[in-house]
Amino acid sequence: MKIRFSILKLFLVVIFAAQASAQSYPFHRVYDTKAKRFVDFEAMVARLATQDLVFLGEQHNDPRTHQLQTAVLEGIARRRSGPIVLALEMFERDVQGSVDAYLAGSLTEEQFLAASRPWPNYPTDYRSMVEFARAKQWPVIAGNIPRRYASQVARRGLVAIDSLPGAERGFVAEQLDCPRDAYWERFRGVMGDMSGHGTPMTPEQAATMVWRTYEAQCVKDETMGESIAAAHAKAGALVIHANGAFHSDYRLGTVDRAKRRAPKAKIGVVSFIPVADLDTANGKPQRKIGDYIVFTLAPERKAAQP
Protein backbone atom coordinates (compact mmCIF):
# COMPACT_ATOMS: atom_id res chain seq x y z
CA MET A 1 0.00 0.00 0.00
CA LYS A 2 2.84 2.35 0.93
CA ILE A 3 4.57 1.60 -2.38
CA ARG A 4 1.41 2.42 -4.36
CA PHE A 5 0.99 5.64 -2.38
CA SER A 6 4.62 6.61 -3.03
CA ILE A 7 4.23 5.96 -6.75
CA LEU A 8 1.05 8.05 -6.84
CA LYS A 9 2.76 10.83 -4.92
CA LEU A 10 5.71 10.79 -7.32
CA PHE A 11 3.34 10.85 -10.30
CA LEU A 12 1.52 13.89 -8.93
CA VAL A 13 4.78 15.69 -8.25
CA VAL A 14 5.88 15.14 -11.85
CA ILE A 15 2.53 16.32 -13.20
CA PHE A 16 2.50 19.46 -11.06
CA ALA A 17 6.13 20.20 -11.94
CA ALA A 18 5.32 19.92 -15.64
CA GLN A 19 2.33 22.20 -15.23
CA ALA A 20 4.38 24.72 -13.31
CA SER A 21 7.04 24.66 -16.04
CA ALA A 22 4.46 25.13 -18.78
CA GLN A 23 2.81 27.97 -16.89
CA SER A 24 6.10 29.80 -16.39
CA TYR A 25 5.94 31.12 -19.94
CA PRO A 26 3.36 33.57 -21.33
CA PHE A 27 0.93 32.17 -23.88
CA HIS A 28 2.83 31.48 -27.10
CA ARG A 29 3.50 29.03 -29.93
CA VAL A 30 6.88 28.31 -31.51
CA TYR A 31 7.14 27.50 -35.22
CA ASP A 32 10.31 25.81 -36.47
CA THR A 33 10.73 27.04 -40.04
CA LYS A 34 13.14 24.27 -41.02
CA ALA A 35 11.02 21.44 -39.62
CA LYS A 36 7.89 23.25 -40.86
CA ARG A 37 5.97 22.50 -37.67
CA PHE A 38 5.26 23.85 -34.22
CA VAL A 39 7.71 22.78 -31.53
CA ASP A 40 8.22 23.15 -27.80
CA PHE A 41 9.82 26.33 -26.46
CA GLU A 42 12.56 24.32 -24.76
CA ALA A 43 13.37 22.55 -28.04
CA MET A 44 13.95 25.93 -29.66
CA VAL A 45 16.17 27.11 -26.80
CA ALA A 46 18.19 23.89 -26.93
CA ARG A 47 18.97 24.57 -30.59
CA LEU A 48 19.77 28.23 -29.97
CA ALA A 49 22.25 27.24 -27.26
CA THR A 50 24.38 25.55 -29.94
CA GLN A 51 24.72 28.71 -32.04
CA ASP A 52 27.37 31.45 -31.99
CA LEU A 53 25.08 34.42 -32.56
CA VAL A 54 21.40 34.52 -31.60
CA PHE A 55 19.12 37.33 -32.75
CA LEU A 56 15.85 37.95 -30.91
CA GLY A 57 13.74 40.09 -33.22
CA GLU A 58 10.99 41.81 -31.26
CA GLN A 59 8.05 44.14 -31.55
CA HIS A 60 9.13 46.75 -29.03
CA ASN A 61 5.67 47.21 -27.50
CA ASP A 62 4.80 43.56 -26.77
CA PRO A 63 5.27 42.69 -23.07
CA ARG A 64 4.91 38.92 -23.61
CA THR A 65 7.75 38.99 -26.11
CA HIS A 66 10.03 40.57 -23.52
CA GLN A 67 9.12 37.93 -20.95
CA LEU A 68 9.97 35.20 -23.42
CA GLN A 69 13.26 36.86 -24.33
CA THR A 70 14.32 36.59 -20.70
CA ALA A 71 13.20 32.95 -20.76
CA VAL A 72 15.49 32.38 -23.76
CA LEU A 73 18.41 33.79 -21.76
CA GLU A 74 17.57 31.53 -18.83
CA GLY A 75 17.25 28.46 -21.07
CA ILE A 76 20.54 29.09 -22.85
CA ALA A 77 22.29 29.67 -19.51
CA ARG A 78 21.17 26.22 -18.36
CA ARG A 79 22.64 24.59 -21.44
CA ARG A 80 25.75 26.57 -22.32
CA SER A 81 28.85 26.38 -20.16
CA GLY A 82 31.06 28.71 -22.22
CA PRO A 83 31.09 32.51 -22.25
CA ILE A 84 27.82 34.28 -23.07
CA VAL A 85 27.28 37.94 -23.90
CA LEU A 86 24.04 39.92 -23.98
CA ALA A 87 23.95 42.68 -26.60
CA LEU A 88 21.15 45.21 -26.93
CA GLU A 89 19.91 47.61 -29.58
CA MET A 90 18.40 49.65 -26.75
CA PHE A 91 21.71 50.99 -25.42
CA GLU A 92 24.16 53.08 -27.42
CA ARG A 93 27.92 52.72 -27.62
CA ASP A 94 28.77 55.92 -25.79
CA VAL A 95 27.16 54.63 -22.56
CA GLN A 96 29.16 51.38 -22.47
CA GLY A 97 31.21 52.73 -19.57
CA SER A 98 28.07 53.24 -17.50
CA VAL A 99 26.81 49.76 -18.37
CA ASP A 100 30.13 48.22 -17.33
CA ALA A 101 30.23 50.22 -14.11
CA TYR A 102 26.75 49.06 -13.15
CA LEU A 103 27.57 45.43 -13.87
CA ALA A 104 30.70 45.78 -11.73
CA GLY A 105 28.75 47.31 -8.86
CA SER A 106 30.41 50.72 -9.13
CA LEU A 107 27.10 52.43 -9.91
CA THR A 108 23.73 52.04 -8.28
CA GLU A 109 20.83 51.25 -10.57
CA GLU A 110 19.56 54.80 -10.17
CA GLN A 111 22.95 56.19 -11.21
CA PHE A 112 23.17 53.75 -14.10
CA LEU A 113 19.77 54.72 -15.49
CA ALA A 114 20.53 58.42 -15.11
CA ALA A 115 23.71 58.01 -17.16
CA SER A 116 22.67 55.52 -19.85
CA ARG A 117 19.60 57.00 -21.58
CA PRO A 118 17.44 53.84 -21.31
CA TRP A 119 14.31 53.48 -23.40
CA PRO A 120 11.11 54.53 -21.59
CA ASN A 121 9.97 50.89 -21.31
CA TYR A 122 13.27 49.70 -19.82
CA PRO A 123 11.86 49.04 -16.31
CA THR A 124 9.08 46.78 -17.59
CA ASP A 125 10.63 45.22 -20.69
CA TYR A 126 14.44 45.16 -20.65
CA ARG A 127 15.46 45.35 -17.02
CA SER A 128 14.87 41.64 -16.46
CA MET A 129 17.35 40.73 -19.21
CA VAL A 130 20.03 43.08 -17.92
CA GLU A 131 19.54 41.92 -14.34
CA PHE A 132 19.74 38.28 -15.38
CA ALA A 133 22.97 38.95 -17.26
CA ARG A 134 24.30 40.85 -14.26
CA ALA A 135 23.52 37.96 -11.92
CA LYS A 136 25.29 35.57 -14.31
CA GLN A 137 28.24 37.98 -14.66
CA TRP A 138 27.75 38.16 -18.41
CA PRO A 139 29.05 41.19 -20.29
CA VAL A 140 26.29 43.44 -21.63
CA ILE A 141 27.09 45.25 -24.86
CA ALA A 142 25.63 48.66 -25.66
CA GLY A 143 25.93 48.07 -29.37
CA ASN A 144 23.95 50.76 -31.17
CA ILE A 145 25.06 54.03 -32.71
CA PRO A 146 24.26 57.08 -30.55
CA ARG A 147 20.91 58.41 -31.70
CA ARG A 148 22.26 61.91 -32.34
CA TYR A 149 24.60 60.60 -35.04
CA ALA A 150 21.88 58.53 -36.71
CA SER A 151 19.72 61.66 -36.78
CA GLN A 152 22.52 63.58 -38.49
CA VAL A 153 22.77 60.87 -41.15
CA ALA A 154 19.01 60.99 -41.69
CA ARG A 155 19.29 64.72 -42.33
CA ARG A 156 22.58 64.96 -44.24
CA GLY A 157 23.49 61.47 -45.40
CA LEU A 158 26.63 59.43 -44.69
CA VAL A 159 28.77 62.53 -45.08
CA ALA A 160 27.70 63.39 -41.53
CA ILE A 161 29.82 60.51 -40.21
CA ASP A 162 32.92 61.73 -42.05
CA SER A 163 32.82 65.00 -40.13
CA LEU A 164 32.81 63.41 -36.67
CA PRO A 165 35.86 64.03 -34.45
CA GLY A 166 38.13 61.03 -33.91
CA ALA A 167 36.85 60.07 -30.46
CA GLU A 168 33.22 60.29 -31.55
CA ARG A 169 33.90 58.40 -34.78
CA GLY A 170 34.68 55.37 -32.63
CA PHE A 171 31.03 55.18 -31.60
CA VAL A 172 30.14 54.29 -35.20
CA ALA A 173 31.15 51.19 -37.17
CA GLU A 174 34.42 51.59 -39.03
CA GLN A 175 33.08 50.02 -42.23
CA LEU A 176 29.81 51.41 -43.58
CA ASP A 177 27.95 49.91 -46.53
CA CYS A 178 24.50 50.84 -47.74
CA PRO A 179 23.69 48.85 -50.90
CA ARG A 180 20.44 48.94 -52.84
CA ASP A 181 19.68 45.31 -52.09
CA ALA A 182 16.79 43.22 -50.76
CA TYR A 183 16.98 45.09 -47.45
CA TRP A 184 16.58 48.38 -49.27
CA GLU A 185 13.53 47.05 -51.10
CA ARG A 186 11.96 45.98 -47.79
CA PHE A 187 12.77 49.31 -46.20
CA ARG A 188 11.41 51.31 -49.12
CA GLY A 189 8.24 49.23 -49.06
CA VAL A 190 7.68 50.00 -45.39
CA MET A 191 8.45 53.71 -45.76
CA GLY A 192 6.18 54.14 -48.77
CA ASP A 193 5.68 57.49 -50.46
CA MET A 194 6.89 60.26 -48.16
CA SER A 195 5.69 63.09 -50.40
CA GLY A 196 2.29 63.14 -48.72
CA HIS A 197 3.61 63.34 -45.16
CA GLY A 198 4.34 66.47 -43.15
CA THR A 199 5.93 69.36 -45.05
CA PRO A 200 4.99 69.36 -48.75
CA MET A 201 7.87 68.14 -50.93
CA THR A 202 8.59 67.14 -54.47
CA PRO A 203 8.96 63.46 -55.43
CA GLU A 204 12.73 64.03 -55.67
CA GLN A 205 12.86 65.49 -52.17
CA ALA A 206 10.76 62.61 -50.85
CA ALA A 207 13.07 60.08 -52.49
CA THR A 208 16.10 61.79 -50.93
CA MET A 209 14.46 61.71 -47.51
CA VAL A 210 13.70 57.98 -47.78
CA TRP A 211 17.25 57.22 -48.95
CA ARG A 212 18.90 59.18 -46.14
CA THR A 213 16.62 57.54 -43.60
CA TYR A 214 17.73 54.21 -45.05
CA GLU A 215 21.36 55.28 -44.72
CA ALA A 216 20.70 55.98 -41.03
CA GLN A 217 19.17 52.51 -40.75
CA CYS A 218 22.24 50.97 -42.37
CA VAL A 219 24.59 52.83 -40.03
CA LYS A 220 22.67 51.39 -37.08
CA ASP A 221 22.91 47.88 -38.54
CA GLU A 222 26.61 48.25 -39.33
CA THR A 223 27.37 49.50 -35.82
CA MET A 224 25.36 46.78 -34.10
CA GLY A 225 26.80 44.14 -36.43
CA GLU A 226 30.34 45.27 -35.64
CA SER A 227 29.60 45.27 -31.90
CA ILE A 228 28.18 41.74 -32.07
CA ALA A 229 31.06 40.34 -34.12
CA ALA A 230 33.63 41.94 -31.81
CA ALA A 231 31.94 40.46 -28.74
CA HIS A 232 31.88 37.02 -30.35
CA ALA A 233 35.56 37.26 -31.27
CA LYS A 234 36.46 37.50 -27.59
CA ALA A 235 36.84 33.89 -26.42
CA GLY A 236 34.29 32.67 -28.95
CA ALA A 237 31.39 33.89 -26.84
CA LEU A 238 27.79 33.14 -27.73
CA VAL A 239 26.21 36.55 -28.29
CA ILE A 240 22.48 37.01 -27.73
CA HIS A 241 21.26 40.21 -29.38
CA ALA A 242 17.84 41.77 -28.78
CA ASN A 243 16.63 44.09 -31.52
CA GLY A 244 13.60 45.24 -33.43
CA ALA A 245 12.53 42.45 -35.77
CA PHE A 246 13.10 44.51 -38.92
CA HIS A 247 16.83 44.52 -38.11
CA SER A 248 17.03 40.71 -38.24
CA ASP A 249 14.09 39.33 -40.25
CA TYR A 250 15.12 37.43 -43.38
CA ARG A 251 18.71 37.50 -42.04
CA LEU A 252 19.10 41.00 -43.41
CA GLY A 253 20.09 44.20 -41.64
CA THR A 254 22.10 43.58 -38.50
CA VAL A 255 22.35 39.83 -39.14
CA ASP A 256 23.89 40.41 -42.56
CA ARG A 257 26.38 42.93 -41.14
CA ALA A 258 27.40 40.62 -38.29
CA LYS A 259 27.76 37.66 -40.67
CA ARG A 260 30.02 39.70 -42.94
CA ARG A 261 32.36 40.28 -40.01
CA ALA A 262 32.07 36.77 -38.56
CA PRO A 263 31.57 34.57 -41.65
CA LYS A 264 32.09 31.27 -39.82
CA ALA A 265 29.60 32.01 -37.04
CA LYS A 266 26.53 29.80 -36.65
CA ILE A 267 23.54 32.11 -36.48
CA GLY A 268 20.06 31.58 -35.06
CA VAL A 269 17.31 34.08 -35.87
CA VAL A 270 14.06 34.30 -33.91
CA SER A 271 11.18 36.59 -34.80
CA PHE A 272 8.49 37.30 -32.21
CA ILE A 273 5.07 38.11 -33.68
CA PRO A 274 2.08 39.12 -31.52
CA VAL A 275 -1.22 37.72 -32.82
CA ALA A 276 -4.81 37.98 -31.68
CA ASP A 277 -5.45 34.22 -31.86
CA LEU A 278 -2.75 31.64 -31.21
CA ASP A 279 -4.94 28.78 -32.42
CA THR A 280 -5.00 30.14 -35.96
CA ALA A 281 -1.34 31.24 -36.05
CA ASN A 282 0.31 29.97 -39.22
CA GLY A 283 4.07 30.01 -39.63
CA LYS A 284 4.24 28.68 -43.18
CA PRO A 285 3.66 31.99 -45.00
CA GLN A 286 6.42 33.61 -42.93
CA ARG A 287 8.90 30.76 -42.76
CA LYS A 288 11.65 32.74 -44.53
CA ILE A 289 11.76 35.30 -41.72
CA GLY A 290 14.10 33.28 -39.54
CA ASP A 291 14.79 29.93 -37.94
CA TYR A 292 11.94 30.24 -35.46
CA ILE A 293 8.78 32.29 -35.28
CA VAL A 294 7.42 32.78 -31.79
CA PHE A 295 3.78 33.80 -31.87
CA THR A 296 2.69 35.59 -28.71
CA LEU A 297 -0.82 36.44 -27.60
CA ALA A 298 -1.15 40.13 -28.36
CA PRO A 299 -2.38 42.32 -25.50
CA GLU A 300 -6.06 43.16 -25.70
CA ARG A 301 -6.70 46.67 -26.86
CA LYS A 302 -8.62 48.78 -24.41
CA ALA A 303 -11.95 49.95 -25.70
CA ALA A 304 -12.13 53.66 -26.43
CA GLN A 305 -13.95 55.66 -23.80
CA PRO A 306 -17.28 57.09 -25.00
Residue ranges and their predicted role:
Residues Q59-P63, F91-V95, P146-A150, A245-S248, ...:
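Solvent-exposed loop/turn segments at secondary-structure junctions
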